Amino acid sequence: MAMQQFDNQISVTQINPAEHYSPAPLKKTSSLNHENVASDAKIVLATINAKYIHASLGLRYLYANLKELQSCCEIKEFVIQTRAIDIVEQILEAKPDIVGFGVYIWNIIETTNVVSLLKVVAPEIKIVLGGPEVSYEAEQQDIVASADFVLTGAADISFYQLCKDIINKTEPEQKILKSTPVELKDLELPYQYYSDEDLKNRLLYVEASRGCPFKCEFCLSSLDTASNPFELELFLDQMDILYQRGARNFKFIDRTFNLNIATTMQIMQFFLDRMTDDLFLHFEVVPDHLPRKLKELLTLFPDGSLQFEVGIQTFNPEVQTNISRKQNNPKSKENLIWLKDNTSAHIHADLIFGLPGETFETFRESFNELYQCRPHEIQLGILKRLKGSPIIRHTETFDLRFNPLPPFNILSTDRVDFATMQLINRFARYWDMIGNSGRFKHSLAHILSDNPFDEFMALTNWLFEKTGQTHQINLKRLYELVSQAVEALFPEKHALIISIIELDYAASKLKSHFGTLHLYAGEQTKSSGQNKLAQRQQRHKL
């Protein structure tokens, strides 16, 4: 990833890495050669995914570009819920000499625990870290203190070079190594290393381009200088191989998929020509760049085949200027409405709360404007401090205060106090359960009217006061709570909502009958009897 040249006035803590890393020459006395590498060393590539359905594209790129070392390498993927000690056990089963970890904001805590344990149990193993979470401000991180090497930036090639040096006993003296920029034409593509199990059960991440020309300061892609495409014919050949093997779920990680319309059209036509009932494509699109010819093509895709992730973030021009975001707001709204009315694409639109200059009131306006565009989902994100992102240049000016622990979310600004930030966090969580889940697709539109933000905020406050929780609410109980909240907050709507919410409840396919729900606040839920501890004690007496 290209480095951003910052102004001297910008307060950014950067690491001081060595010059671009190049491999040391092989020692003349070394017995290493391409034929005996596999018997001389063992490499494990590992990462901790947020969910099982996520397959690591980054690890597969590293594996694809290991050349003669590939035969002695193994990929091991884990999920967040796995205990660190169990991950260490599974890694050690491979008897590795080198372990490379992909480190991201969602797995930094868990990976730190694994690396710490691994260094205690098997200190002789060389641990190499890479990924966005350790590519910046690395020297201040606990995980780096435990590791042997850190490769910053795109490590597709530099990981191979470092492994050769470690195996050959010519490893560099520096711990933090800056990867040489990668020419995409020099990369071996990784798609053949998706297994049949991956194709059957997991999301397949693919990329037709790398980088982003936009400079939105909350995003690490703002450090890129441009969006660089892979050779299109080669990329489509790889997609065809995946398709012929049975792949039907493709998630493009391109930051700006519709930047080059000619390329976008060819990729879309490629998949349209192979359309089946189970083919599903996921793209991140620029909201104000949908020319007529692309629109015409999009109308040809059947229901259930497309999902568009549309980054709006904010409609406030002042905030957009603060974060260097260029967006034609009227055109973005027009295109969102057009997509909803004229295509079968599932539209997932993003807003971010806590941006420099944003207030409760301006965020309310952005939410209401986006709601009127009628996307299927509105993802309400809370600003996070991604290491290396230019957003931190605003820290003093806007008194940005971030959580020191992952996920490094914003806690307050000069415009938004901590209590308000917590309020929006609850709003976002309830919106995800009620608005984005699709569980209330019939009734929610009737609960909210001309002022959806304030009405849903009232619902948020009522639900939290009633339950004191934003997680682990039983679905049947959630239907009851929403009905009771409407009775308390909007009594004139309650009779209508009861009749409509029955449609939502039926769609949920819960086993209990709708007539058994407590839809009125005055109804008392029957006691569940003994609490769990008493039940446990009672079993020992039987």
Please name every model-derived segment:
Residues 2-245:
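Acidic, low-complexity intrinsically disordered segments
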Residues 56-59, 85, 111-112, 232, ...:
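Conserved strand-to-helix beginnings and helix N-cap segments that scaffold or border functional pockets
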Residues 188-341, 345:
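Radical SAM [4Fe-4S] cluster-binding motif and immediate context
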Residues 98-100, 126-128, 236, 243-253, ...:
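Conserved C-terminal portion of the radical SAM core fold
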Residues 1-48, 67-68, 84, 91, ...:
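Radical SAM enzyme core and accessory elements
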